[in-house]
Design a protein with these regions (language model features):
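Sequence/structural signature of outer-membrane beta-barrel proteins
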Residues: 71-78, 110-116, 147, 198, ...
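Outer-membrane beta-barrel "beta-signal"
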Residues: 348, 362, 376-390
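Detector for outer-membrane/organellar transmembrane beta-barrel domains
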Residues: 42, 57, 233-332
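N-terminal periplasmic/intermembrane-space "pro-region" immediately following the signal or transit peptide
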Residues: 2-69, 390
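Outer membrane beta-barrel transmembrane domains
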Residues: 313-315, 319-353, 357, 361
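Outer membrane beta-barrel
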Residues: 51-214, 222-229, 233-242, 311-314, ...
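Transmembrane beta-barrel architecture of outer membranes
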Residues: 88-90, 121-125, 186-188, 225-231, ...
C-alpha cells in the first residue's frame, strides 16, 4: 500500500494542469460510433501531465460524462388514476478511465427521483476491470448482470422508449421476483473474454460468467448463497451474435414478515435465455427467456413465467432510425396471462448529443381481461422523449 507521502504526491499532481479533449468528430451514423452499447456517452477526457514518477507509472486517464432524458406520455387506458404526464426518466453522471494501462474503472450515479429507501440519488455502477487480455478479463464491483443481450444496453441505445418486458421482468431491470429497483445490476465478480479472431478482426466466440450476491445494487449479501450467471455466444459474422444465457440464483426477502402468510422468506431464480443480435446501421435483436421462482411479496402469485421479443431497426435517413418491436410477457407462463406490446419508434439524432424520440405502443393485456375484476385490456400509449448527453 502507498505511504502517505506518495498519496499526497498523487493528490497534488492530480491538481496539476489538465488537458480536456474535445468530443469525437466521427461523421458516421450517430450509433455507429458506439459499438459497445453499454457505454453511455462520448464524455470529456482529462489527461494528467506530470513529471512525478508515480503518476507517470500509473498513466491515469479520466473521462466525465452524463445524460438527461425527459419524457411526456399519454395513454387512453380507462380506469387509471392518470392518463400520463411529464417525467424525468434519467439523470445520470459518470466517471471512468484507466490506470496502469490495464485497469479500467467506472463510477456512475443516477441522481433523479424522490429520495427514499432505494430511491433518489444512488450509485448504479462502481467497478474495476482488469483488461490486459481480450481473452480473459476480470471485473469486480457493482455492474450489469451477465444475463441477456439487451440488459447491458444503455437506455440511449435500446432504440425504443423502454426495454423489452423480458429484460424488465426476467433480466432484472425491474425484476418480477420483488427485488428493489436495481437496473439489471448486482454486486459481484465476473470473468469474460473473446476468443478466436477472424480475418476481419472480430472474435468468433464470447464467454462471460459471474458470481453475484443476488440482492441487487447497493445492498450487502444476507444469505449463504451466491448467484451464478453466465452467457456464451457465437459470432459467425461481424456485428452478429447468437447465443444463450443461464442464471442459478436466489433472492432473500429483506422485508420478510413471518406474520403474513403471503410473505416469502426467499425465492429461487432459475432462468435461461437464448437469442441473437445484429447491431450496425440496421438492428435485429430477439430473445426468449424463461424463469422459475415466485414473488417474495405474494406467495400466491405464479412461480413460472416467460417472455420474448423481436426488435427491428431500420435507418431511413442519415440521422433518422425507425424501430419496431413485438414484445410479449406471460407472468404465469400461460396464454391467458399474456401481455403483448406492439411498438413503433422514430429516433432523430441531432448531432451526437441530442436524441429526439417519438414512441407508440399498442398493448393487448389478456391477464387484465381475464382478471377477477377485469380492467381495460386494449389501449394505446404515446410518448415523446428528449435526451441531451455530454
Amino acid at each position: 500500500m502507498a505511504n502517505p507521502q506518495t498519496l499526497l504526491a498523487l493528490i497534488l499532481t492530480a491538481a496539476a494542469p489538465l488537458a480536456a479533449a474535445a468530443h469525437e468528430t466521427d461523421e458516421t451514423h450517430p450509433q455507429a460510433a458506439y459499438t459497445d452499447l453499454d457505454y453511455e456517452t462520448p464524455g470529456y477526457t482529462l489527461n494528467i501531465n506530470s513529471n512525478n514518477p508515480v503518476v507517470q507509472q500509473m498513466q491515469p486517464t479520466f473521462k466525465f460524462g452524463g445524460y438527461i432524458m425527459e419524457k411526456y406520455s399519454y395513454s387512453d387506458r380507462s380506469g387509471q388514476t392518470t392518463n400520463g404526464g411529464f417525467d424525468t426518466r434519467f439523470v445520470r453522471l459518470y466517471m471512468d478511465g484507466k490506470v496502469y494501462q490495464d485497469f479500467y474503472y467506472k463510477l456512475q450515479m443516477e441522481v433523479n427521483g424522490q429520495p427514499g429507501v432505494d430511491k433518489g440519488p444512488r450509485i448504479v455502477d462502481a467497478f474495476v476491470e482488469w483488461q490486459k487480455y481480450d481473452c480473459f478479463r476480470v471485473k469486480l464491483g457493482q455492474f450489469k448482470r451477465s444475463f441477456g443481450f439487451e440488459n447491458p444496453y444503455s437506455p440511449l441505445n435500446v432504440g425504443l422508449g423502454s426495454y423489452s418486458q423480458a429484460t424488465m421482468k426476467i433480466a432484472s431491470i425491474s425484476d418480477r421476483i420483488g427485488e428493489h429497483k436495481s437496473s439489471g445490476r448486482d454486486v459481484g465478480v465476473q470473468v469474460q473474454g473473446d476468443l478466436f479472431p477472424a480475418a476481419d478482426g472480430h472474435k468468433w466466440l464470447h464467454y462471460q460468467i459471474g458470481f453475484f450476491n443476488g440482492q441487487g445494487i447497493n445492498h450487502t449479501d444476507i444469505d449463504h448463497h451466491k448467484d451464478l450467471i453466465g452467457g456464451l455466444w457465437f459470432s459467425p459474422l461481424k456485428n452478429l451474435a447468437i447465443g444463450g444465457f443461464g442464471w442459478n440464483g436466489k433472492y432473500t426477502n429483506e422485508a420478510y414478515n413471518p406474520n403474513n402468510p403471503n410473505s416469502m422468506r426467499s425465492a429461487k431464480r432459475v432462468r435461461w435465455g437464448a437469442g441473437l443480435k445484429y447491431e450496425d446501421k440496421w438492428t435485429v435483436r430477439g430473445e426468449y427467456m424463461s424463469s422459475v421462482g415466485g414473488v417474495v411479496s405474494n406467495a400466491t402469485l405464479p412461480d413460472r413465467s416467460d417472455a420474448w421479443y423481436l426488435t427491428l431497426g431500420v435507418p431511413v435517413a442519415k440521422d433518422v432510425k425507425v424501430y419496431g418491436r413485438y414484445d410479449c410477457y406471460r407472468d404465469a407462463k400461460t396464454w391467458n396471462s399474456l401481455i403483448a406490446n406492439y411498438g413503433l419508434s422514430g429516433n432523430y439524432y441531432l448531432g451526437k448529443n441530442l436524441i429526439f424520440q417519438l414512441n407508440y405502443t399498442f398493448t393487448d393485456n389478456r391477464s387484465a381481461r381475464r382478471a377477477a375484476v377485469p380492467t381495460d385490456s386494449r389501449y394505446n400509449t404515446i410518448d415523446v422523449q428528449v435526451t441531451a448527453r455530454f
